[in-house]
C-alpha cells in the first residue's frame, strides 16, 4: 500500500515537472517579442538666433560722388541711387515691425544768432518752417520778443555768447542735444539758419532706418577724415584718433539710440568739456564722439548741402529731391541752386522762395505763373 502510494506521488511529480517544462517552451512562441524601448535622439548643439545687424543695405545712404565738399572715396553708400536701396524696418528681436516714421518724430534744431533774426530766420519762417513748425526749435543767444511771439516755447535762449567762437558754438550744440533728449522724439537733426530743409525728403530718408539703430548721417565738408589728439599718456605723449564728421553747415541727423550712447560725453554740459579736451568746434566734436569714441561710422549722404560747395551744379528737378540746401555768403552771392523759379534773382537771391513754391505751389504768397 505504501509502495504504491509512493509510486503514484513520483509519477505525479514527474508529470508536473514535464508539464511545466512544456509550458516554458511554448510560452515565448505564443507571444511576439517585446518591442525595444526607443530613446529620444540626442539633442544637437543649440544654434544661436541670427544676429540682427543694425545696418541698412549697402550702408543705405548713397556715397558722395560729387566733387569739392563731398567725402570723396569715403562714401559708404550705393552709387547712382538718390535713396537707400532697401528700406530696413528693424525692430527688437521677437518684437513687432518698426512703426512708420512721421514728421512729428523728428526734432529739427536750427542754430542762429541775434543778428540773423530779421534776415535769415524771417526767410525760414516764411518758407520751410511753415511746413514743420511743430518739429522746429530755434536755438539762439538773445531773448527776442518778436521771435518769442512767433515761435513760442520753440525758441530756446541758450544764454551762450553771440561771438562766433568754438566755445560759443559748442555751448549751443550742448543745449540742442539736451533739449532733444528731453523731447523724447526719435531723431535729432541739426541745421543752420542758412539751410532750407525739405521735410518730405528728410522724412523719406530717415524712414529707411530705425531710431534704435546707431545712425549718424550727413555730408562731410572735407574729402578726408580729420585727426585729433585724444589722450595724454603718462610720459606726456599724446594719442590721436582719426574720424569723419558731418559739417553742421549742411545739416546732419542722429538717431535717438545713438544719441543716448553719446550721453557720457555730451549731456548736461559734458559736450563742452569734451570739445575743450580735443579743442574742436561743435560739428567736429559730434563726429569725434560718434566715430572716434563710439566707433559708429558716418553715413555719407549727398542730399545735404552747405554754402561751402558749388551749389550751381544743383539744377532743375534734382533740387527738389535734396534734404537740405544753402546759399553763398555775401562775398559769393551767386553761389545758389539753379532752379527755374517763380521769382527773379532780385526778388529771391537765395532761391529759397522759388524752391518752396515749386514744392508747395498752394502757398498763399506764391505767384500763379513761373517766370521765364
From Swiss-Prot:
Belongs to the glycosyltransferase 31 family. Glycosyltransferase that initiates the elongation of O-linked fucose residues attached to EGF-like repeats in the extracellular domain of Notch molecules. Plays an important role in limb outgrowth, it directs the formation and positioning of the apical ectodermal ridge (AER), one of the key organizer centers of vertebrate limb development. It comes from Gallus gallus. This is Beta-1,3-N-acetylglucosaminyltransferase radical fringe. Residues 64-78 have a biased composition (Gly residues). Substrate binds at residues 120, 193. It comes from the Eukaryota. Its EC number is 2.4.1.222. One of its GO terms (cellular component) is Golgi membrane. GO terms for molecular function: metal ion binding; O-fucosylpeptide 3-beta-N-acetylglucosaminyltransferase activity. InterPro entries: Fringe, Fringe-like_glycosylTrfase. Residues 30-48 have a biased composition (Pro residues). Mn(2+) binds at residues 194, 307. Has some activity with cobalt but not with magnesium, calcium and zinc. Keywords: Developmental protein, Differentiation, Disulfide bond, Glycoprotein, Glycosyltransferase, Golgi apparatus, Manganese, Membrane, Metal-binding, Neurogenesis, Signal-anchor, Transferase, Transmembrane, Transmembrane helix. It is found in: Golgi apparatus membrane. Residues 28-372 are lumenal. Residues 1-10 are cytoplasmic. GO terms for biological process: cell differentiation; nervous system development; pattern specification process; regulation of Notch signaling pathway. The active site is at 283. The gene is RFNG. Glycans are attached at residue 159.
